[in-house]
Each structure stands twice: as structure tokens, then as C-alpha cells.
Curated annotation (Swiss-Prot):
Species the sequence originates in: Avian erythroblastosis virus (strain Sloan-Kettering)
Keyword line: Oncogene
Short name of one Pfam family: c-SKI_SMAD_bind
Source lineage: Viruses, Riboviria, Pararnavirae, Artverviricota, Revtraviricetes
UniProt xrefs under PANTHER family: SKI ONCOGENE (PTHR10005:SF15), SKI ONCOGENE-RELATED (PTHR10005)
Protein name (database record): Transforming protein Ski
SMART domains documented for this protein: c-SKI_SMAD_bind (SM01046)
GO biological process: negative regulation of BMP signaling pathway; negative regulation of transcription by RNA polymerase II; negative regulation of transforming growth factor beta receptor signaling pathway
Region feature (Disordered): 308-365
Gene3D superfamilies: SAND domain-like (3.10.390.10), Ski (3.10.260.20)
């Protein structure tokens, strides 16, 4: 093909036309001995779907967020907060010139978008911008954190370090200090000193690179090696530093890792006023002595006053659940004529009274204080649910002891005169008589 096209004055197009003409002559039957080459028809290219167009999020719902202790108005666009840039420049970054701010934005590759007409109108109505403002820039919360961290904050020296010898800063190694790291904006490793975490803004994490101290919410923005300036960051909030700071992977021992992880969780739980961090409690955190005491109390509460104890079935998870009590053995009673039905009835009544008193005393004395409803504490659905579940497992004799007939104990129990209702005197009045006029 290449040789023929080069020798032809028409180039490849002329050769293709001549080759097609020769194939046409062969199809007409001039040379039937040679096989005819049938090419499959060329399929047209598939129709490519058009680009997926999605309308941009033009949310006009204004909300507020906290940036470096200042309240900034923002709009939630695309799932992330976009802050009012003029408000940041006039409050948080008021000590910096526009030239300094622009240079940092260029270095960190921070892009600021423009708000829509509706968003601009809302900011004007709320008094955040003057009515003469032609436009307003919006910056994401993530980029605002990066910008403020680059301009505002630097680390502090360790408490036992002399500033004159700042080139030789040593690590603040204590009995409880351990290594941590984060993976935000290029990663950074540090040494956490729990003893120094005395307030939410206390510098308690020492960077292993520059040896300066940072608060937890500033350490997660701090980085040295790769700043990830060409990475699109989304959804960062320094207030969520409890989720960003992790235990160092240098600790491989199981016991050491568990101990340091518990120290890190205790540190994260401090000053958590909004209860954002909730660690998973272990399944059995009670000591064996406390568990044994609780099991004994539970067995005592389920004691059958009639003479037998409740049966506890062990579940697959190791817990013991009471089951129905075994059927009491019937004593053989000789049907003799000397035993009168009146004495039998009295014995039944006395046994019922003993079972009633013992069950009530034991149920009052053995019920856990948190399971008992108090008149000075509001009702809790969890407590009532636990009591309801516990009552379903109690033996039938204890459950049914509160339901009895007072009439059956009239002969065995002396009446309480002090609590008896006052006797009402019957007033007999003569019925009115009809008078006939």
C-alpha cells in the first residue's frame, strides 16, 4: 500500500480508488477462479451520550459558622459551607494587607467564587454588606482554614525550652506522652502530652519536625512536607480534630496499643461540650469482683420463697437469664380423717402470707437503685423498659404475689383500726307522703 501510494501521483486516495475499481471488476465475473474478498460492512460509530449536565447548587439559605473565634455568615453550596470573604477580611484578617492575602492565596492555590444575585441580596438585607456592594466573594470553609493558618498562627515553644537555644529544641517526653499523627493537608507527626491539655486552646502537641507546640485544632492544619496545594480539599473543619488525630502506627504491641488508645480517648473526651466525640465502650468493662457481686444480687432477688430457687439459663453470650421455676414437688399427704379442712385452709393462708412478705422484702431490698422509680426523679423510658423486661423473667410466684384477695385473709390478719374508714351512720328519713287536697 505504501509503495503503490508513493509511486502514484494521487497519493493514497488514488490508490484506494484504483483498488476499489479492481475489486469491482472481479465481482463482475472476469476472473472467477480467484476468490472474492468480501469485507464486512463498516459499522457506524456508536452515538456517544452527551455530557451529564447538572444544575449548579444555588442555595440561598444563610447560616453562620465560627472561624478563629469570629462569627461568619455563609451559604451551604454543594454540601460545604462557603464563607463571606469580605467579612473574613474585615474581622479575622483585618491586620493583613490585600497584597499579603493574595500572595498566600496564590501560593496555596485558593480560588474564591462569586456569589449569586440572590445570595448578594440576602447579605445586603442582613446588613453584612453595604447596599452599594457590586459583588461578593465566597471562600470554602476548608480554604478559609488553610488561609488563616498560614497568616495567623505559628507554633509556640515548649514550656521547658529556652528561646535562646531554639535550634536545639528537645521533645517533651513525659510518663503519659505518646506519638500521634494526622493525614490532613500533607500529614504530620507529633508528640501528644496529655498533662499540658488544660484548656481547649492549650498547646499540647509537639511537631516532630519543627519541635513547636500546637493546640489540637491547629495541629491538624499544620504540615511541613507535602502541602497538597494542587489537591481539591472538601469538608474539612478544625472543630472535628478528634476524628483527625490518630495514634501513631509505631506502636505494634497489643497491650501498649490498647493502653495508649485509651489515653487518647480520654484526652479527646475532655472539653467536649457538644458531645461530638463518643467512643465505643467495651462490652464488659466491669471488674470480675463487681460482676460476681451483681450476679449474687440477681440470684438473691430471684430466690423462690416457697422453698426453691429460680433456674438461670446461660445464654451463648455468657449472660444468665432466669427461666420458669421448676414445678414444686408435691408432698404426699395421707388422706386421713383426722386432718380437718379448716386446718388445711389456715396452713395455706399462713404459707401465702409468708411468701408474700418474704417476696416483697426481698424485691425491695435487692432491686438495683437505678431500676427503682423515684418520686423525685422524672420518669425514664429506659428504666421502665428494664423493669418490664425483668418482670417477665421473675418466677410466677413472685409475680402473682401482689394479686390476692383480701377476703381470704380476714380470719388470719387483724384489722388495722387506724386505717379503717370511718363508719358512716345511717340516717333514716321518713319518706315523703303525698297530701290529698
Amino acid at each position: 500500500f505504501h509503495l503503490s501510494s508513493m509511486s502514484s501521483l494521487g497519493g493514497p486516495a488514488a490508490f484506494s480508488a484504483r483498488w476499489a475499481q479492481e475489486m469491482y471488476k472481479k465481482d463482475n465475473g472476469k476472473d472467477p477462479a480467484e476468490p472474492v474478498l468480501h469485507l464486512p460492512p463498516i459499522q457506524p460509530p456508536p452515538v456517544m451520550p452527551g455530557p451529564f449536565f447538572m444544575p449548579s447548587d444555588r442555595s440561598t439559605e444563610r447560616c453562620e459558622t465560627i472561624l478563629e473565634g469570629e462569627t461568619i455568615s455563609c451559604f451551604v453550596v454543594g454540601g460545604e459551607k462557603r464563607l463571606c470573604l469580605p467579612q473574613i477580611l474585615n474581622s479575622v484578617l483585618r491586620d493583613f494587607s490585600l497584597q499579603q492575602i493574595n500572595s498566600v492565596c496564590d501560593e496555596l492555590h485558593i480560588y474564591c467564587s462569586r456569589c449569586t444575585a440572590d445570595q448578594l441580596e440576602i447579605l445586603k438585607v442582613m446588613g453584612i454588606l453595604p447596599f452599594s456592594a457590586p459583588s461578593c466573594g465566597l471562600i470554602t470553609k476548608t480554604d478559609a482554614e488553610r488561609l488563616c493558618n498560614a497568616l495567623l498562627y505559628g507554633g509556640t515553644y515548649p514550656p521547658h525550652c529556652k528561646k535562646e537555644f531554639s535550634s536545639t529544641i528537645e521533645l517533651e517526653l513525659t510518663e503519659k506522652s505518646f506519638k500521634v499523627y494526622h493525614e490532613c493537608f500533607g500529614k504530620c507527626k507529633g508528640l501528644l502530652v496529655p498533662e499540658l491539655y488544660s484548656n481547649p486552646s492549650a498547646a499540647c502537641i509537639q511537631c516532630l519536625d519543627c519541635r513547636l507546640m500546637y493546640p489540637p485544632h491547629k495541629f491538624v492544619v499544620h504540615s511541613h512536607k507535602s502541602l497538597e496545594n494542587r489537591t481539591c480539599h472538601w469538608g474539612f473543619d478544625s472543630a472535628n480534630w478528634r476524628s483527625y488525630i490518630l495514634l501513631s502506627q509505631d506502636y505494634t504491641g497489643k497491650e501498649e496499643k490498647a493502653r495508649l488508645g485509651q489515653l487518647l480517648d480520654e484526652m479527646k473526651e475532655k472539653f467536649d461540650y457538644n458531645n461530638k466525640y463518643k467512643r465505643k465502650a467495651p462490652r464488659n468493662r466491669e471488674s470480675p469482683r463487681v460482676q460476681l457481686r451483681r450476679n449474687k444480687m440477681f440470684k438473691t432477688m430471684l430466690w423462690d420463697p416457697a422453698g426453691g430457687s429460680a433456674v438461670l439459663q446461660r445464654q451463648p453470650d455468657g449472660n444468665e437469664v432466669p427461666s420458669d421455676p421448676p414445678a414444686s414437688k408435691k408432698t404426699k399427704i395421707d388422706d386421713s380423717a383426722s386432718q380437718s379442712p379448716a386446718s388445711t385452709e389456715k396452713e395455706k393462708q399462713s404459707s401465702r402470707l409468708r411468701s408474700l412478705s418474704s417476696s416483697s422484702n426481698k424485691s425491695i431490698g435487692c432491686v438495683h437503685p437505678r431500676q427503682r422509680l423515684s418520686a423525685f426523679r422524672p420518669w425514664s423510658p429506659a428504666v421502665s423498659a428494664n423493669e418490664k423486661e425483668l418482670s417477665t423473667h421473675l418466677p410466677a410466684l413472685i409475680r402473682d404475689s401482689s394479686f390476692y384477695s383480701y377476703k381470704s385473709f380476714e380470719n388470719a390478719v387483724a384489722p388495722n383500726v387506724a386505717l379503717a374508714p370511718p363508719a358512716q351512720q345511717k340516717v333514716v328519713s321518713n319518706p315523703p307522703c303525698a297530701t290529698v287536697v
